[in-house]
Amino acid sequence: MLSLFYQRISTYIKLSASSLLSILPLYRPFQRRRLTMPSNEGSISSSSTTRPKDVLVVGGSYSGLAAALNLLDLCQGRSCRFAGALDPEISEPAEMRERVPVQITIVDERDGYFHLIGTPLAFASEEYALSAWRKFADIPALQTPAIKFIQGSVTRVDCERKISTIKEAGTNNEISQKYDYLVASSGLRRTWPSAPQSLNKDKYLEEVGEHIAKIKMANGGVVVIGGGAVGIEMASELKEMHPDLRVTLIHSRAKLLSSEPLPDEFRDRALELLHETGVETILGSRVIRTTQTELNGAATPSYTLSLTDGRTIKAGYVINAISKYSPTTAYLPSSVLDKEGYVKVNSALNFTDEVPNAKYHFAAGDLALWSGIKRAGRAMHHGHYVGMNIYQQLLNERFGTKPKFSEMAHAPPSMAVAVGKNTVAYGTEQGVVSGEEIAKIFFEDDLGFGICWRYLKLGEAPK
């Protein structure tokens, strides 16, 4: 599911806000509308006695962390950490960087940041899995009194009173917490193996260990069901990490990635790269039944898969990678949700006016009802804009300045899929590109973990 970067990338794509964020499979996704903001000269200066504004961020993944950290940068008088992605002429001018006291609370069901893009590799390599999950308490960028973390889930939001109800993990104690601004960035509920189901690192490592143990015992090979991005990446990473393992991918449609609005050239190239990796494929036939054979003294289990075309396939382990997901928005008023549960937003990522105090409520990332294929790069871009827009409102409240909001542009479909050592990518301007060099640009050698970590500056302690 994405990426960002430095000198090596400028040789391939012009370094700009859009290209920087395209590195997490999307190309030139957004533009920023520039408005004029009056100078703050003569306004009331910051005071240490002013009550900090409380910002509640629901979800601590790509969009939530991007919103929290960019907002904190601005409120502490610095350029936001994503400002390097912007051309100098659209970066925040110095007069915008007034200090504003802020207290940010991040609520997440997990005890840490998990690099979701790397899920296929995490489920193939225990060594990689260990680094893909970082506890919030161990992330240097979050170690500041201005950021508080609660492991738990938000169960209700009262937009009119600006009060949330939070259920703490472990104790199930309910906390009533007031806020001045809310960022809904809790993402999508993904089924296994699109994401680990564990909520703390120790359990996650057990989950991964059990899965990889079954892979190693699969004498009859592994079958991956589903030819979307998750299935393709899962199958190819298994083959890369376990080259002697027979891996077969089964997809019910004639083309891979059949649910995405992408050109056939992209789908065909993904299939070619999958075959180059050594993965076998069966297309155009659906699995209608999976039967586990009795062990009868055998050391490893065996499975028989029956297909709609009459064939039967034997396997030592079966992975159902047909992605199922839904927005995690049950805590929000139904009036701001569409029929599928996505949050209705305007171009500044505010809730639409169906709820009271809409301008104090934002949605970012996969749960926001906005155009484009949902990707981590886009989620971080959402968070960036939300952070800047909250800061603009804080300046308005504190100094009376006219807000200069950053507005999202609608984005066409774009995607990059890692296929072993290669990557195939598509954008409306670039078309379909693929190869190992493309993989280095989009994912480096760790499915984008280092790229996202550096871009979010998670390893840098607060100044």
UniProtKB/Swiss-Prot annotation:
GO terms for molecular function: electron-transferring-flavoprotein dehydrogenase activity; flavin adenine dinucleotide binding. Keywords: FAD, Flavoprotein, Oxidoreductase. 6-hydroxy-FAD binds at G59, G60, S61, Y62, S63, V154, D366. Coiled coil: none annotated. Pathway: Siderophore biosynthesis. It comes from the Eukaryota. The keyword Oxidoreductase applies. Binds 6-hydroxy-FAD non-covalently. Its EC number is 1.-.-.-. The keyword Lyase does not apply. Its cofactor is 6-hydroxy-FAD. Induction: Expression is induced during iron deprivation and is regulated by the transcription factor SRE1. GO terms for cellular component: cytoplasm. Belongs to the FAD-dependent oxidoreductase family. Oxidoreductase; part of the gene cluster that mediates the biosynthesis of hydroxamate-containing siderophores that play a critical role in virulence via intracellular iron acquisition during macrophage infection. PANTHER family: APOPTOSIS-INDUCING FACTOR 1, NUCLEOTIDE-DISULPHIDE OXIDOREDUCTASE AMID-LIKE, PUTATIVE (AFU_ORTHOLOGUE AFUA_1G17180)-RELATED. This is Oxidoreductase OXR1. It comes from Ajellomyces capsulatus (Darling's disease fungus).
